[in-house]
């Protein structure tokens, strides 16, 4: 047993998990349950009453958090301690949205001042493009921006830009490219005019394989349309730490925006990686996005655990994964603009907490990161919700919905809300055999048929969910929502005693991918690998099955 599973509180939770009543009973005996098990902060409202939890459950979970020094770990992160112990790095994405007068010292430098300088540089750049003063090589203003990245430098900007579609200023179109599949960039370049297109290349090293390959293809397309190498500086900018490589490529040093080691890719949308967001919604709205996230940072850092929204959500995820064997968690967004959030939270959580050793290198003997998945309501109700209601696996759910729509057309939003709330009720309440049989009482079926169909209509209920509401989707509430999930991810990792801020599995994939590339291009012998890999490489070389 590990140190965590040996703790008395952990073992008490194991025993307690087997004694809980069905949620139907909890609601019937606790008339104040909704009031007692809901909270709000930073423009968000969290109803966590539809969870398999009593007051004793909550007390034990909060005690586990305290026993594992969660509060001191939160302080360590905000203080800039090197909590990423495998890479000896601070974890300070929170500094990217800190106010200008904040002082956070890393390696002798006030990094908040550096962040503010970058924001000022971003403001100048955004103004020059949106005003039309930035001209391409033929003197025309820029109309289209192509953002090239991968992972966090792609998914964050794309999903946030999509979510904040109502706030686009309309001066620019933005296109996102990530996949190294040539089809992706080929399709994006169709219909674009090289004279009015600008590329933003985001790679800390300026050498990420997919990003560099796509950028070189973009450059070849640009030069192939009549531009010259000297024109590259007017149509390519970079977000990178490698100034030398970027300038060698042809990018003006003044048009290179910095990245820092204390920000991981999946936490980087708040930095210059978010440049595409700012180009679409303007810097004022981008700063509102940062302000909303900072407000959640303050809530997380300063609120007692018992009222702390990220702590509550993180504890529930741990509760189901470790004590009910839940292997996945579904995120359901009842707002079309938020349809991409499940994919963003998937990367955030699974890349952070998909770990199997503790900080000191001990193998864990408990489940860590679950599979995160989901989609938008009400589409999912006609697909995978069936599994949520009657499947054999326990799958906790988060429902996310604004109370007010940006597009209040007819009865659409009230129907959306009725479906959202109805799903949470159905998951909690279920339907008993007796209830199903009673519903069939007036049908023309005989008694034997009624009894059979009733068995198929039984739903066990007791399926947990959280509901997160906001008045309206704004840059501020979106910032708070994303920061909520960032900190929820941290809470789990801190209690599991794992490093949520490295990604060695990703690094191994890159390393082996490069080795296979050498063999695919025949610069290395394919027969040195396992027989499966050898066979696949040889099939690729011959080009047919």
Swiss-Prot record:
Keyword Metal-binding in annotation: no
Catalytic activity: alpha-D-glucose 6-phosphate = beta-D-fructose 6-phosphate
Pfam families, per the entry: PGI (PF00342)
Primary role: Catalyzes the reversible isomerization of glucose-6-phosphate to fructose-6-phosphate.
Gene Ontology MF term list: carbohydrate derivative binding; glucose-6-phosphate isomerase activity; monosaccharide binding
Broad class of enzyme this protein falls into: isomerase
One cellular component term from this protein's GO annotations in UniProt: cytosol
Active-site residue numbers: 351, 382, 510
Intracellular or extracellular location(s): Cytoplasm
UniProt pathway annotation: Carbohydrate biosynthesis; gluconeogenesis; Carbohydrate degradation; glycolysis; D-glyceraldehyde 3-phosphate and glycerone phosphate from D-glucose: step 2/4
Assigned keywords, A-Z: Cytoplasm, Gluconeogenesis, Glycolysis, Isomerase
Family per record: Belongs to the GPI family.
GO biological process: gluconeogenesis; glucose 6-phosphate metabolic process; glycolytic process
Protein name as catalogued: Glucose-6-phosphate isomerase
Entries under PROSITE patterns matching the protein: P_GLUCOSE_ISOMERASE_1, P_GLUCOSE_ISOMERASE_2, P_GLUCOSE_ISOMERASE_3
Major subcellular location class: cytoplasm
Enzyme Commission code: 5.3.1.9
Cross-referenced CDD domains: SIS_PGI_1, SIS_PGI_2
